[in-house]
């Protein structure tokens, strides 16, 4: 069964958005999509009163779990991914749209997987499980999308990853020194 994509947004997304969504979902095993009914593209997400969220934040995506007889579905806000103000903000958002959409969609799909299909994940472990799932499948999606730039930088990836880990470690140590 294929996941349906509905566009309820007044914001015009890039023309191949549906193909992008299908390519992102193709990077995830088909069993992990079991039960996911649809993906809805909207302008902004208006959470209902059951969801506690700080004011002033704009959700890029929201997962709606199974409720009664309705199957689970995902909602993605194009207003958060494609801002309407400022030429350079709009340009940067259009250039990064594919990657941002992949991150949001894989995060929502990870929530679906961890809440409905995966067993043994406790509430306290949910955020870490979703993050690791998203990173794993984002990496595989990015590798499948790789053009000439990806092929050129592939030999340098291990070195760049080690450098990023050392910078992250140094950042965490500095953060501990400042708070401690």
Predicted feature residues:
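Mid-chain, well-packed structural core segment of small domains
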Residues: 80-95
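A metal-dependent hydrolase signature that marks the N-terminal structural subdomain at the beginning
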Residues: 1-75, 88, 171, 175-179
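Active-site recognition of the HExxH zinc-binding catalytic motif
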Residues: 99-116
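Hydrophobic (often cysteine-bearing) scaffold residues that line and stabilize catalytic clefts
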Residues: 17, 98, 102, 126
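Soluble, non-transmembrane catalytic domains of enzymes that act on hydrophobic metabolites at membranes
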Residues: 116-118, 122, 127, 147
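An active-site-proximal "capping" alpha-helix that borders the catalytic cofactor pocket
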Residues: 124-140
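Long, well-structured alpha-helical subdomains associated
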Residues: 6, 14-15, 140-180
């Amino acid at each position: 069964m294929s996941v349906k994509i509905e566009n309820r947004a007044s914001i015009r997304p890039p023309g191949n958005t549906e193909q992008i969504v299908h390519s992102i979902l193709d990077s995830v095993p088909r069993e992990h999509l079991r039960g996911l009914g649809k993906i809805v593209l909207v302008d902004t997400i208006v959470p209902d009163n059951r969801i506690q969220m700080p004011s002033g934040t704009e959700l890029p995506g929201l997962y709606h779990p199974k409720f009664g007889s309705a199957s689970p579905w995902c909602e993605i806000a194009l207003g958060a991914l494609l801002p309407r103000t400022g030429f350079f903000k709009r340009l940067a958002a259009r250039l990064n749209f594919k990657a941002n959409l992949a991150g949001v969609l894989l995060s929502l799909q990870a929530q679906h997987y961890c809440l409905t299909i995966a067993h043994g994940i406790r509430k306290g472990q949910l955020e870490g499980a979703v993050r690791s799932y998203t990173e794993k499948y984002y990496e595989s999606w990015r590798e499948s999308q790789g053009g000439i730039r990806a092929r050129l930088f592939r030999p340098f990836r291990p070195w760049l990853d080690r450098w990023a880990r050392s910078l992250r470690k140094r950042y965490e140590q500095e953060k501990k020194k400042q708070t401690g």
